[in-house]
Amino acid sequence: MSRIQVQGVHHITLVGSNRQSAMDFWQGLLGMRFLFEQPNLGNPNENHLYFDPGDGRLITVFTNESRRDDPSPHPRDIGHLEHIAFNVSRATQTQVAERLQARGIPFKSFDRGFMDSIYFSDPNGLRLELACYKFQTPAGVRDADVLVRADAIRRKAGAHHINEQHLADAIEELMTERDGRRS
């Protein structure tokens, strides 16, 4: 049986509260470019706001002026969204904690071995992550290629998780292959 081959994420749509809250958070805090707004064609009581998270793809938000923010945490059950992660530069990552603190937004920071992560919630309890890789992907190589290679190196070494040495070795191997160099 043939599979259906996807080519990436097209968009992610969230249920938000009202327009102003969505604009304040997605554009005001996260700096996403507001693209346009139109009625939600599936529900005449909602508007549909479109934002660019920085890579040309779409984050969209359904809003309704009668809804108010509800920061209650979302259930972490099977079939529910755990969180959405957005890529940020190293320079931005170093400023995130201070900027969230200035707005009174609680957060938690984690070192994930191959990336640094900061987690916080939107005004409606959706958990978000701002992530920054600990490597710069070489030209002609994808982030996923570096991570898969680093994981193979980690496993061969019997290490618990990917660390910066595994990343450095993976990048060296991938660039050697890309450039046709011999060791």
Identify the meaning behind each predicted range.
Residues Q7, G16-Q20, D77-G79, H83-R127, ...:
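Vicinal oxygen chelate
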Residues L58-V61, E129-L130:
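Short glycine-/small-residue motifs
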Residues G54-L58, S66-R67, A91-Q93:
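Short, charged/polar surface micro-motifs in flexible loops or helix N-caps
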Residues D143-I153:
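Low-complexity, intrinsically disordered terminal/linker segments enriched in charged
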Residues M1-L14:
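Short, extreme N-terminal leader segments that mark the start of a protein/domain
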Residues V15-I59:
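Core segments of cupin and vicinal oxygen chelate
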Residues N45, R67-S72:
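A short, acidic/glycine-rich surface segment
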